[in-house]
């Protein structure tokens, strides 16, 4: 059994009500519950954290050095385009990670086209709405080789 960490960046606590035409109507607790259930079905544990504060996400990433986390799934939200610190934290712990986005940043404003994480991620899943999370998790499960 592997432990997976799912991180959500700024404004994702507003899912379901914030710009539903872009992000959909499903809430973050619904996403977390569905992913935890799928991970458990595959024999893995999954914990999640959402924060609007960059330092909280960084501290949680640092904690993976000692808590047995095997893989990180992260939707960094707007930190994708601004946070060298988040990139450095992910590199410091040297765990594989997948970058996730509900929308496709490349079809949006030009400032959203650059990611500070993508070149270091195992993969990037974007543009599939809530299914972006599911697709990313399935990829991680396949990488771990324990899909049941």
Swiss-Prot record:
Q: Please give the SUPFAM superfamilies that the UniProt record associates with this protein.
A: Type II 3-dehydroquinate dehydratase (SSF52304)
Q: Which GO terms describe its biological process?
A: amino acid biosynthetic process; aromatic amino acid family biosynthetic process; chorismate biosynthetic process; quinate catabolic process
Transmembrane parts of this sequence:
none
Q: Name the gene.
A: aroQ
**What Pfam families does the entry give?**
DHquinase_II
In the record, the note on similarity to other proteins reads: Belongs to the type-II 3-dehydroquinase family.
Instruction: Fetch the InterPro entries from UniProt.
Output: DHquinase_II, DHquinase_II_CS, DHquinase_II_sf
- State the UniProt keywords alphabetically: Amino-acid biosynthesis, Aromatic amino acid biosynthesis, Lyase
What's the subunit arrangement here?
Answer: Homododecamer.
Q: Where is the active site?
A: 23, 101
Q: What's its EC?
A: 4.2.1.10
PROSITE patterns (UniProt xref): DEHYDROQUINASE_II
> Location of site Transition state stabilizer?
18
Reported function: Catalyzes a trans-dehydration via an enolate intermediate.
Query: Which pathway does the UniProt entry assign to this protein?
Result: Metabolic intermediate biosynthesis; chorismate biosynthesis; chorismate from D-erythrose 4-phosphate and phosphoenolpyruvate: step 3/7
**Annotated substrate binding sites:** 75, 81, 88, 102-103, 112
Show the GO MF annotations.
3-dehydroquinate dehydratase activity
Its recorded name reads 3-dehydroquinate dehydratase
| Top EC class, one word | lyase
Q: Which Gene3D superfamilies match?
A: Dehydroquinase, class II
Reaction(s) catalysed by this chain, per the record, are:
3-dehydroquinate = 3-dehydroshikimate + H2O
Is the keyword Amino-acid biosynthesis in the record?
Answer: yes
């Amino acid at each position: 059994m592997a432990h997976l960490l799912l991180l959500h960046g700024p404004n994702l606590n507003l899912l379901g009500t914030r710009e539903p035409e872009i992000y959909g109507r499903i809430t973050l607790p619904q996403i977390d519950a569905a992913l935890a259930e799928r991970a458990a079905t595959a024999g893995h544990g999954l914990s999640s954290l959402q924060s609007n504060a960059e330092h909280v996400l960084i501290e949680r990433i640092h904690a993976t050095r000692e808590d047995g986390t095997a893989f990180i799934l992260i939707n960094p939200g707007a930190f994708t385009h601004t946070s060298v610190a988040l990139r450095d934290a992910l590199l410091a712990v040297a765990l594989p990670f997948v970058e996730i986005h509900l929308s496709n940043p490349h079809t949006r404003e030009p400032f959203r086209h650059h990611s500070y994480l993508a070149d270091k991620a195992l993969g990037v899943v974007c543009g599939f709405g809530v299914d972006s999370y599911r697709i990313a998790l399935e990829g991680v499960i396949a990488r771990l080789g324990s899909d049941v």
